[in-house]
Curated annotation (Swiss-Prot):
Domain of life the protein comes from: Bacteria
Family of this protein: Belongs to the adenylosuccinate synthetase family.
EC number: 6.3.4.4
Bound cofactor: record note: Binds 1 Mg(2+) ion per subunit.
Active site: 13 (proton acceptor), 41 (proton donor)
Subcellular location: Cytoplasm
GO CC terms: cytoplasm
GO molecular function, one term: adenylosuccinate synthase activity
Identification of the protein by name: Adenylosuccinate synthetase
Species per Swiss-Prot/TrEMBL record: Rhizobium etli (strain CIAT 652)
Residues involved in substrate binding: 301-307
Catalytic activity: IMP + L-aspartate + GTP = N(6)-(1,2-dicarboxyethyl)-AMP + GDP + phosphate + 2 H(+)
Amino acid sequence: MTNVVVVGSQWGDEGKGKIVDWLSERADIVVRYQGGHNAGHTLVIDGTSYKLSLLPSGVVRPGKMAVIGNGVVVDPHALIAEIEKLAGQGVTITPDNLRVADNATLILSLHRELDAMREDAASNSGTKIGTTRRGIGPAYEDKVGRRAIRVMDLADLDSLPGKVDRILTHHNALRRGLGVAEVSHQTIMDELTSVAERVLPFRDTVWLFLDKERRRGARILFEGAQGSLLDIDHGTYPFVTSSNTVAGQAAAGSGMGPGSLGYILGITKAYTTRVGEGPFPTELKDEIGEFLGQKGHEFGVVTGRKRRCGWFDAALVRQSVATNGITGIALTKLDVLDGLEELKICVGYMLDGEQIDHLPASQGAQARVEPIYITLEGWKESTVGARSWADLPAQAIKYVRQVEELIGAPVALLSTSPERDDTILVTDPFED
């Protein structure tokens, strides 16, 4: 038996939600370890769609414990709203199936406002990052700046006013510089006290809880929220998220040691998508890109934003295999490629007349690279709902094998529709 870390190997939206749900049936505990409510995922269970953005996927399955780790930034209002929405769908969330790390940072209204103000200012100067405006980045800034309000602070009303003063000293200075009204101390105090009773019952010393469960033999599934190429260090900086999204963060963001992580499963879409700004070497702005977007329903769960689409970039995924230590991949949305006469895979780039095998870290160089493609024959037959290799056309199998060879990692699972059971299992990541 081993634990499993699920990471996205591209820019997010790889189909992690379905795979995590599929794996959660084999897990006892599902842990979110980074990000906030800026990355959504959709689960389809018995014909019912559940759209989650903060809660771990395991929360919709009976008998599973969901954990929000210390690496997550928690908007308490978003947490309460998501719990209430699930209640309306018949899913009851209590401390018996959800724990929130007491040392997790809270997202406040002033974080959301600052996020939006910065994006608006950047839009006017052409330097927009393309955030979801949900306050994720500013909350992480306060965490690193050692002025954040954390979940545990909601239980200590004696020391909370001083902590609010500290965070407002910083934020009101920023607001004065931006020419907007300052936030009053009472506004933030009221905001925090209004959610305390709803949030505090879920708080726990998560590292201790997970350590006890690990020693007891529980199977733990770590759920990443965004793709590796959005990692603050290893992604396409500055067009990245504000946290580490690679597999190593599963340890830091949950309080478990790296030796407890086990199998690293990279969720990998059979083509490439990206939301928002930033480099995208294989982007297709033609009818094929439109075809992929429409057939793949490439619209953001959280924002509704249309995703940019392009050919599979093996060079980028190969980089993710290295930075995450990926053991195997779950290849998703192969069925979206059905019907295309030919398919292209990027195997490297040309940069200023030189051939390179990875995307450079420099923003300027990233904008200048040109993809080097190989071309494969497509297939006319449908792969939708395939549950064994025998159900796949020969050219589809050839495409999968080519992907494995180019990225240097085997396919452990192959997803052929949004339905959980439409999955070909090659290797069970939870097996010893």
